[in-house]
UniProtKB/Swiss-Prot annotation:
Entry-linked CDD domains: YtnP-like_MBL-fold
Protein's name according to its UniProt entry: Probable quorum-quenching lactonase YtnP
Top-rank EC class of the record's enzyme: hydrolase
Membrane-traversing stretches: none
Cofactor binding, note field: Binds 2 Zn(2+) ions per subunit.
Sequence positions that bind Zn(2+) 2: 115-116, 212, 257
GO molecular function: hydrolase activity; metal ion binding
Family classification: Belongs to the metallo-beta-lactamase superfamily.
Highest taxon in the source lineage: Bacteria
Positions bearing Phosphoserine: 36
Role summary: Probable hydrolase that is able to inhibit the signaling pathway required for the streptomycin production and development of aerial mycelium in S.griseus. Thus, serves as a defensive strategy against competing bacteria. The putative target for YtnP may be a gamma-butyrolactone termed A factor, which is the quorum-sensing signaling molecule that positively regulates streptomycin production and development of aerial hyphae in S.griseus.
Induction: By the antimicrobial streptomycin, produced by the Gram-positive bacterium S.griseus.
Length: 281
C-alpha cells in the first residue's frame, strides 16, 4: 500500500476495487485523440478507474475518504457494464495496518454515487448492514437529500442499498465542515449537486482531494469535465477555484480513481513536480 505524509497527517491508499468506465463518458466533449494521449484506454474504449479509499490518520483518528466499490454488492450485469474486474479488499488492507473496520472513526463521503458508496454496506445473510459500525459518515446536506430522493437521471447511481443501513450514522453539513483541525470538507456541487472536496493541511503542507471534479491527473484542464457531471458549468469554476487554492499552497493533489498516480504536485507549466505512483499488482 502506498503511503505519504502531509505534515503529521498520514495518508494510506486502501484497496477498494476497480472499474473500467467508458472513456468518452469520463472526458465528456473532449475528443478522444486528445484525452487518449493523457490516459490509457482499452479496446472497449474503457479507462481504468480505481475506487480506492484514502485512510487519513491524525490526532488518533482514523478517517476514510469514500468507501470503495464494496464486496458482493454488484450483479453480474452491473460488473459488466461498469467494467468491474475486482471488488473491494478494504478489510484485508486495514488488517495489514493492524486495523479493523471497527477502528474507523469517520468516513468523509465526497458524494454518494455507487462507485464511492457501495462499500458503506455489506450483506449479512439476506440483510444489509453497515461495514463501518462505529464511524460517523459525513456528507453534504444536499448530497444526502439527493441520495434519498433521486431524480430520473440520478436514480441510476443513488441506490437505497447503499444508504438505508447506515442512515443513523450520517451527519450532514451545509458549506464547510471541520472534521478535525486541518482536515476540512467543502461543498462544491458540479459533479453532483451535493459534491464536496476535502483539504488536509498540517505543518505548512497541504493536500487537496478534488474527488470527481478532477478524478484523474488527466482531468487537470478545468474544461475537461465528465459527461457524468450533473452541473458541468458549476464543475468548471469550482475546479478553477480549488486549483488556484492548491497552486497558492504548492499543494499535493490526491486521487481516489487514478490508476497511475496516488498523488502529485504540478509545476506552474503543468509538468509534474513530484508524484506518488500507484504500485500495480
Amino acid at each position: 500500500m502506498e503511503t505519504m505524509k502531509i505534515g503529521n497527517i498520514t495518508l494510506t491508499w486502501l484497496d477498494g476495487g476497480v472499474t473500467h468506465m467508458d472513456g468518452g463518458a469520463m472526458f465528456g466533449v473532449v475528443p478522444k485523440p486528445l484525452w487518449s494521449k493523457k490516459y490509457p484506454v482499452n479496446e472497449k474504449n474503457q479507462i481504468e478507474l480505481r475506487t480506492d479509499p484514502i485512510l487519513i490518520q491524525k490526532d488518533g483518528l482514523n478517517i476514510i475518504i469514500d468507501a470503495g466499490i464494496g464486496y458482493g454488492k454488484l450483479t453480474d450485469k452491473q460488473k459488466r457494464n461498469y467494467g468491474v474486474t475486482q471488488e473491494s479488499n478494504v478489510k484485508p488492507s486495514l488488517a495489514a495496518l493492524g486495523l479493523t473496520v471497527a477502528d474507523i472513526d469517520v468516513i468523509a463521503m465526497t458524494h454518494l454515487h455507487f462507485d464511492h458508496a457501495c462499500g458503506l454496506t455489506e450483506y449479512e445473510g439476506e440483510r444489509l448492514v453497515s461495514v463501518f459500525p462505529n464511524a460517523v459518515i459525513y456528507t453534504s446536506a444536499v448530497e444526502w437529500d439527493e441520495m434519498r430522493h433521486p431524480n430520473i437521471r440520478s436514480k441510476n447511481t443513488y441506490w437505497k442499498e447503499n444508504w438505508e443501513a447506515v442512515a443513523g450514522q450520517v451527519k450532514t453539513f451545509e458549506d464547510t465542515l471541520t472534521i478535525t483541525e486541518g482536515i476540512t470538507m467543502h461543498h462544491t456541487g458540479g459533479h453532483s449537486d451535493g459534491h464536496s472536496v476535502l483539504i488536509c493541511e498540517d505543518a505548512g503542507e497541504t493536500a487537496v482531494h478534488m474527488a470527481d471534479l478532477m478524478p484523474t491527473h488527466a482531468h487537470r484542464n478545468p474544461l475537461w469535465v465528465l459527461a457524468y457531471d450533473d452541473y458541468p458549468m458549476t464543475s468548471i469554476p469550482q475546479k478553477q477555484k480549488w486549483q488556484a487554492f492548491a497552486a497558492e499552497k504548492d499543494a499535493w493533489f490526491i486521487f481516489y480513481h487514478d490508476a497511475e498516480y496516488r498523488a502529485l504536485q504540478w509545476e506552474e507549466d503543468g509538468s509534474i513536480k513530484k508524484s506518488v505512483k500507484r504500485m500495480k499488482r
